[in-house]
Curated annotation (Swiss-Prot):
Tissues and organs where the protein is expressed, per its UniProt entry: Highly expressed in brain, cerebellum, and kidney. Lung, pancreas, and gastric mucosa show a weak expression. Also expressed in certain liver and kidney carcinomas.
Transmembrane feature ranges: 616-636
Localization in the cell: Cell membrane
Disordered as annotated region, ranges: 259-288
Residue stretches of biased makeup (Polar residues): 269-279
Keywords: Calcium, Cell adhesion, Cell membrane, Cleavage on pair of basic residues, Glycoprotein, Membrane, Metal-binding, Phosphoprotein, Repeat, Signal, Transmembrane, Transmembrane helix
Organism of origin: Homo sapiens
Chief location bin: membrane
Gene behind the chain: CDH6
Keyword Nucleotide-binding among record annotations: no
Recorded GO CC terms: adherens junction; catenin complex; cell junction; glutamatergic synapse; nucleoplasm; plasma membrane
Name this polypeptide is given: Cadherin-6
Amino acid sequence: MRTYRYFLLLFWVGQPYPTLSTPLSKRTSGFPAKKRALELSGNSKNELNRSKRSWMWNQFFLLEEYTGSDYQYVGKLHSDQDRGDGSLKYILSGDGAGDLFIINENTGDIQATKRLDREEKPVYILRAQAINRRTGRPVEPESEFIIKIHDINDNEPIFTKEVYTATVPEMSDVGTFVVQVTATDADDPTYGNSAKVVYSILQGQPYFSVESETGIIKTALLNMDRENREQYQVVIQAKDMGGQMGGLSGTTTVNITLTDVNDNPPRFPQSTYQFKTPESSPPGTPIGRIKASDADVGENAEIEYSITDGEGLDMFDVITDQETQEGIITVKKLLDFEKKKVYTLKVEASNPYVEPRFLYLGPFKDSATVRIVVEDVDEPPVFSKLAYILQIREDAQINTTIGSVTAQDPDAARNPVKYSVDRHTDMDRIFNIDSGNGSIFTSKLLDRETLLWHNITVIATEINNPKQSSRVPLYIKVLDVNDNAPEFAEFYETFVCEKAKADQLIQTLHAVDKDDPYSGHQFSFSLAPEAASGSNFTIQDNKDNTAGILTRKNGYNRHEMSTYLLPVVISDNDYPVQSSTGTVTVRVCACDHHGNMQSCHAEALIHPTGLSTGALVAILLCIVILLVTVVLFAALRRQRKKEPLIISKEDIRDNIVSYNDEGGGEEDTQAFDIGTLRNPEAIEDNKLRRDIVPEALFLPRRTPTARDNTDVRDFINQRLKENDTDPTAPPYDSLATYAYEGTGSVADSLSSLESVTTDADQDYDYLSDWGPRFKKLADMYGGVDSDKDS
């Protein structure tokens, strides 16, 4: 529908003030236009001033979203100078002029060419002016007016999120806050109810509710259980116009998840479990697994297992597998089928975290009975002790019984057991054991001073099943017997001054004993009976395992007796008494007035001879000269014994090659020069062997010189014959070592032992006639026949 508005500008001549009048208007919207009078004054030839009415307007109103086929009429502009003759021209400028808004330049009618949207631009400011069409000059000042776009309800509410996600604990009270949703409306909130939004719930009842004005979603049902239903989808509607009929609406989806609380106790799926385990299971061995189910999740489903009652509280244990939430029953102590075959346990499963507000639901734990059957296993023998300690005197004879060990089969069969000694622990086979009763006895003599403790291992093995065996350590202590005599702790050699007084101490003696008596050592010292009478010295026993040598007279003469050998008898007080005689050497020496030794007879024991520096230098020079002389003499002798460069004629035709040299090429690449055979004059005279000199020397025989055309074969034969008849040629009477020739050779082996083929071909009886030196050899070779006979 087109809306018309006419603005009439009236001019009244002769009135002293302007008069406002209401313009004619047609407006379907019912909004009255405000009147505004703009007075423009003009000059006239008469002195009478006249006031003119110019534009009368303020603003236009225009509905948005116009859907008509024609342009939407906005209003009309009119000037009082417009006489209808087309002399004026109306011009429009400002927001949307010429595009959104056009004006009829003749009539001043304004129209909208496009559909307008208030949400895009609610106000347009334009300017209007009337000009003289002929001169182009404005006849009225330019004036500004406003076109306001009137809002209609053309926008539905839009939520800030398409999908909301929220959580709320299960078992919550009614009215528990869940989440708040928000929707906005682009319409003008200041005009009508187009932007007034009201919330309502379309889906999700009776579990949840929503506040109509705030959009807050709350729980509407008591004790919603996650285990029954965990996910909920709620659809919320936002409607404008205050929810009235004809209002626009929008919806959103809220996905609500119930979070878990610990409202379910653990429960065993069965009341009784049974497992089997062999009695040989070591501590820590898992026997079986039990599992209680808990409908909760996360930490609310964590379970702790414990043994609360039963016959095996101290024999078994239960641990919790944190990954699978299973209870693992393990062996805590060693089991014995012969003692107990069946155990009954009570295992409890409980939640470590319990919310007090759910205690009314009952105890958060459950129990089950576990029956464990112990299976019999063929066990090795068991010794009566973990270790044995025995004692024996070191003077015990061979086959002396020390003690015994005992082991038996723990199984019900009671298989017999045999005993043995682990020879890796008794390499010298000092001990042995009776395989039947386990008695330990000696097989060799013992010596405590050699080894005090003997640590061996005894093995007990089932006769019917040798694989079943066990070991036990056996510690044998050798008890001491007084079988060692005491002796001096060191070699004693002392001196006495010539001017010594009687009863003067010249040496303190100490003794040691390899034995270890229970009451400790107690030694006694005395002079040997043969030296006790007429001795120049006496022995004083200090009763503390030491003794002192005292002078018996005043003064000693080293020229009469320079050395005294003093035999001292050392005895112990153990049984049987052991004693030994040690000799103390006492030298008579010259001493100073302080008693310090200066010289003893013709030699000094401690002090140097007192040579002067010059004498020492002379001695050193003599030693150097002597060494130089020896070195020169040895060098001259070596020069004289240098080997000659010329080799013997026997070696002329020989190529000596060492074939045991690996690498470096072969040495026989330099073959014998055949030219030597053709030039015998170049051969030197025969020379004797350098390594062995014969006892009788013969003059070398000169061989005739062969002609140049002498046949090589004749020359070689001549040389061969010459060497065969030469007494100076080898072999000499010396030891020669030959390699094994083998049996394929015509000469067989050169070994005399291989010269006969069988033992029967050689008679060794003659070796017995060679005397006692060859008796061993005669026994070796003469006993062959007897061995065969046997």
